[in-house]
Amino acid sequence: MEHSEGAPGDPAGTVVPQELLEEMLWFFRVEDASPWNHSILALAAVVVIISMVLLGRSIQASRKEKMQPPEKETPEVLHLDEAKDHNSLNNLRETLLSEKPNLAQVELELKERDVLSVFLPDVPETES
């Protein structure tokens, strides 16, 4: 019995050429997957080892950073920071002082509004 012949239960006209059968056998071949599985396992082990090394180095760096006293700033840096703060405060004071209205005049205006609202209540607008 040849491979090109159909199976006994196949309908007529389903004859498969020998070349197609060989190609299908090669395409759907089954082989031992052990080398592939071992290579993936080795790759995963390498990734785990590298991750553990990096994690350990990160932990050690954090510990060293916590153990060291904070860096003292040089007097030049402190002087520059103070100068910046002083300049910003001066700018703020100048801005606020230049925009400060006359308080007596503001109080007088508020009192006039209150008096007018007491003597002349708002007349509700009527719709015509």
Swiss-Prot record:
Catalysed conversion reaction: taurocholate(out) = taurocholate(in); estrone 3-sulfate(out) = estrone 3-sulfate(in); dehydroepiandrosterone 3-sulfate(out) = dehydroepiandrosterone 3-sulfate(in); tauroursodeoxycholate(out) = tauroursodeoxycholate(in)
Transmembrane segments: 36-56
Keywords attached to this entry: Cell membrane, Lipid transport, Membrane, Transmembrane, Transmembrane helix, Transport
Tissue expression: Widely expressed with a high expression in ileum. Expressed in testis, colon, liver, small intestine, kidney, ovary and adrenal gland; and at low levels in heart, lung, brain, pituitary, thyroid gland, uterus, prostate, mammary gland and fat.
Side of membrane Extracellular, spans: 1-35
Places the protein is found: Cell membrane
Pfam families, sorted: OSTbeta (PF15048)
GO cellular component, one term: membrane
Membrane topology: Single-pass membrane protein
Cytoplasmic domain ranges by topology: 57-128
Induction of the gene: Positively regulated via NR1H4/FXR.
One of the GO BP terms on file: regulation of protein stability
Gene Ontology terms, MF aspect: bile acid transmembrane transporter activity; protein heterodimerization activity
Family statement: Belongs to the OST-beta family.
Assembly and interaction partners: Interacts with SLC51A. The Ost-alpha/Ost-beta complex is a heterodimer composed of alpha (SLC51A) and beta (SLC51B) subunit; induces the transport of SLC51A from the endoplasmic reticulum to the plasma membrane.
Disease annotated for this entry: Bile acid malabsorption, primary, 2: An autosomal recessive disorder characterized by chronic diarrhea, severe fat-soluble vitamin deficiency, and features of cholestatic liver disease.
Function description: Essential component of the Ost-alpha/Ost-beta complex, a heterodimer that acts as the intestinal basolateral transporter responsible for bile acid export from enterocytes into portal blood. Modulates SLC51A glycosylation, membrane trafficking and stability activities. The Ost-alpha/Ost-beta complex efficiently transports the major species of bile acids (taurocholate). Taurine conjugates are transported more efficiently across the basolateral membrane than glycine-conjugated bile acids.
Swiss-Prot/TrEMBL domain comment: The transmembrane domain (TM) is the major site of interaction with SLC51A. The extracellular-membrane interface is absolutely required for transport activity. The intracellular-membrane interface is necessary for establishing the correct membrane orientation that is essential for the heterodimer Ost-alpha/Ost-beta complex formation and transport activity at the cell membrane surface.
Name of the protein this chain belongs to: Organic solute transporter subunit beta
Organism of this sequence: Homo sapiens (Human)
Species lineage: Eukaryota, Metazoa, Chordata, Craniata, Vertebrata
Gene behind this protein: SLC51B
